[in-house]
Amino acid sequence: MKVQNKWIRAAIPALLLHCSIGTVYCWSIFSQEIADYIGFSKGATEWAFSFAIFFLGMSAAFLGNVVEKDIHRSSLIAALCFAGGMAGTGFFIWYGGNNPGSVLALIGIYICYGFIMGVGLGTGYLSPVKTLMLWFSDRKGLATGLAVAGFGAAKAIASPIMQTLLDSLGDGGIYKMFFILACVYFVMMFVGHLLLAKPEGWHEPTGADKGPG
């Protein structure tokens, strides 16, 4: 029998998921280092972050029905896309370091950090928010606060860790950091995925239940 506790089934998973995906906003910490390592201008690499935010919105808009139907599936999609995109970004940074000025490396970073991680961001944001609202239906302000807290804490917690990794990993530290973080965030998000669950017996209202509108 599954544990039915709003903190275990909603709050903790939300923090695990949001503290992971919220690190997308740490881009400014390492964007210049990526640009220098792969042989492009900082302006060229900045598009990766722009694409990530764009696809965050697009995936949230168009994959909302997946979240509504099955948050367990959507949270798994989020974990796979976010961690996979981060690992892929690390690979193309490594490739760009070995082939300075390679357009393939730059496009690979756009796809991995921008598109793949962007999809993980959108689904990863919606999945716990939906669940929080169900578990904390009488305290929606608290539910919203918990969701925002995870995003806000992500950069504050991850920024010094990322900087320490960059300083300690030496040559090629930038791509090594992405590989390490991909593993860490996958574990965090997968645990969140396993814990995340709607209240037992809850079903999405049908059109008839919602009434005319």
Predicted regions and their residues:
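A structural feature recognizing the 12-helix transmembrane core of secondary solute carriers
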Residues: 1-213
